[in-house]
Amino acid sequence: MIETDAVVIGAGPVGLFQAFQLGLQGIGAHLIDALPQAGGQCVTLYGDKPIYDIAGIPVCTGRELIDRLLAQLAPFKPHWHLNTLVAALAPQPDARLLLETDTGARLLARSVFIAAGVGAFVPRTLKMAGMERFVGTQLFYQVLPAGMDVTGRQVIVHGGDEGAVACAVELAEQGRAARVSLLYRRDLFQAPEALLQRLQRLRAAGRIAVEVGQITGIASSGMPQCSTLRALQVVDAQGASHALPVDVLVAVLGISPRLGPLTDWGMAMARKQLQVDTEAFRTSVPGIYAVGDINTYPGKRRLILCGFHEATLAAFAAAEALKGDKVALQYTTTSAHLHRLLGVAPASGATGP
């Protein structure tokens, strides 16, 4: 059992800023996200698209914004639970909140901040009978597990977007796999030009094989409960079928949002969004706050900068609830206390305890 003052569900831009604002209040946080990396849809869907309405930043991409937020958050050393879904959330007799994840972790928190956007983004899966047997051993969605050894193995990356191309290119450049194939329904990929040029160079050198076609079946060996994936049956544009040997399959098919069990946690909702007050962005369940696109209130605007405002007020409210007293307003420009929390040298003229 992990006991903590705060859990933030969702590691998109608003969730990251929520953890930062909690850090300024001296509150450590655990961050949980369904994706294998921080950033939410800001990275996964809009990583290379420009954002023009973040205060003080004339323009940045979604990925650049997340990189800046992660750097800003770094001094507070949050605890990460990535590739993880919250399966259950329930108030306890002592007013704390018990969270259970799909990985088996249990967290007992004094406050919970839901920054889940339009829901937990989960990978789109292959809709093919029998594929589920290989998930986590030979079949992986979106990314390979960190540190996985593919030496001497035949790896197929299935997908046509930037994530798929990047995965195949990285594997080929590492040079450990016996063969790297990029499988997609057509020989046209959606990725930045620089990445496509790397792909072309690797193709020309014979280090990546691009396979055009669609998966229609699989070949495996062994008993059903302990079988091994051996090959994919693929049909090309001309209708010809052939087998592609495979040891490791990485399916990069995009992601889709899912509210999941959130609707069962007893909070008041309207049109699939959590109803909150505008003083502290509290939900109808004590100790649970909701910020960003997941919440709704009169005048709501689904903008990142509005989520930053909500996260700030929620952090102040939670700090007062946890400490049982009003929280003094301090400024990062002058507060020696905040400078110590941030690990920065005091500015000239800084004051405070």
Swiss-Prot record:
It catalyses: 2 reduced [2Fe-2S]-[ferredoxin] + NADP(+) + H(+) = 2 oxidized [2Fe-2S]-[ferredoxin] + NADPH. FAD binds at residues 33, 41, 46, 86, 121, 293, 333. GO terms for molecular function: ferredoxin-NADP+ reductase activity; flavin adenine dinucleotide binding; NADP binding. Its cofactor is FAD. Keywords: FAD, Flavoprotein, NADP, Oxidoreductase. InterPro entries: FAD/NAD-bd_sf (IPR036188), FAD/NAD-binding_dom (IPR023753), Fd--NADP_Rdtase_type_2 (IPR022890), Ferredoxin-NADP_redctase_2 (IPR050097). Belongs to the ferredoxin--NADP reductase type 2 family. This is Ferredoxin--NADP reductase. It comes from Verminephrobacter eiseniae (strain EF01-2).
